Amino acid sequence: MAEKILENKDPKLEAMTVDHEVSAPKPIPVDEPTLTRVARPLRHVRHIPVKSLVFHSKHGPITFSYENKIKLPISKNKLVVQVNYVGLNPVDMKIRNGYTKPIYGEAGIGREYSGVITHVGDNLTNRWNVGDDVYGIYYHPKLAIGALQSSLLIDPRVDPILMRPKNTLSPEKAAGSLFCLGTALNLLAQLKEKDQLNTESNVLINGGTSSVGMFAIQLLKRYYKVSKKLVVVTSGNGAAVLSEHFPDLKDEIIFINYLSCRGKSSKPLRRMLDTGKVVDYDDFNTLKETEDYTQGKFNVVLDFIGGYDILSHSSSLIHAKGAYITTVGDYVGNYKKDVFDSWDNPSANARKMFGSMLWSYDYSHFYFDPNIKIIPKKNDWIHECGKLLNEGVVDCVVDKVYSWKNFKEAFSYMATQRAQGKLIMKVEGF
């Protein structure tokens, strides 16, 4: 059949073309190509980037570094805190002074902070939560790490840390409280344990506007209830500063202006004991006022400035079986030269060993290491500090707050040793 059809071909049909009226297909719409940013899946993020303020030696500059990272997931016994504020302390400059050559790599700055928890280890979820406002101490002076970082990896078994009460303690004050308050609290507790401090103690404070000095004044009057007036050696405007911040205590303090006696504070102190009168001079050595003094020699001398002037006249100033405790040593503190953990001079070492026998009083150089593993468990100083701050028994006096971009200005001011209160650095988010 097919063969017959093929044999009967029609040439006209073969030459014909047929046009079909069919419309073209409708074009497919295509959106304009755009690029959009999407969040990286968390499973791909293996670390937390960290911005730090570091140095390499005391001769080199302080700079920002991006080398440090916090590995994820974190250890089950640790926390990550996003740092908002950091308190500066003289020990920061003393540690830097110990790095004479840039052979140790980067070294961090800052020993105390306030911030917000961003990561919680598995074993700590019953105590801490993401979003908790906290403050604490990050004290590792021999490990070349500091708190001036955008994020910190915290081990609560070593690093003191507390919840910050938002209504009673600002983040700025929280960042500058624990190191100096802890120093003052432990120093006075040591005197109390030795029966060298009680409500009838006559106390002399050398360096009343230092941060430790301010906390010591508050603790002596409000916590230890010392009834006698405190004799406080301070700078020309120190009396005004202390009176402004602690109006309830200004009548409980006898101020000695060391500038009016060319830094030899022992001279007006001895005159005060000899005459029974408190003579106050202004910066032009003009007599301002006189009041009676009947408290006698001192049971306790707290030195936060250093120097040998008061010690050289200790027999006429300090009671037998009294106590002289310093946080600096025989030499007047010099933030530009002093080195952390350096040896005391021979005379100071001799006083520590034989002071009670040769000079009839107890001499000690107090060092505060807030590492929780070092301090006995019965000494719950960190929570006691938190309670004192929360209840308003003590207050942190903040002198100035700097952005950490202005770190040069902050460290220059601290080097003058004229700060009257804490210097706080504001850490920007990263």
Swiss-Prot record:
GO terms for biological process: protein targeting to membrane. InterPro entries: ADH-like_N, GroES-like_sf, Lipid_raft_assoc_Zn_ADH, NAD(P)-bd_dom_sf, PKS_ER. Pfam families: ADH_N, ADH_zinc_N_2. One of its GO terms (cellular component) is cytoplasm. GO terms for molecular function: oxidoreductase activity. Present with 937 molecules/cell in log phase SD medium. Lipid raft-associated protein involved in the targeting of PMA1 from Golgi to the plasma membrane. May induce clustering of PMA1, which facilitates partition of PMA1 into lipid rafts after leaving the ER its and transport to the cell surface. This is Protein AST2. It comes from Saccharomyces cerevisiae (strain ATCC 204508 / S288c). The gene is AST2.
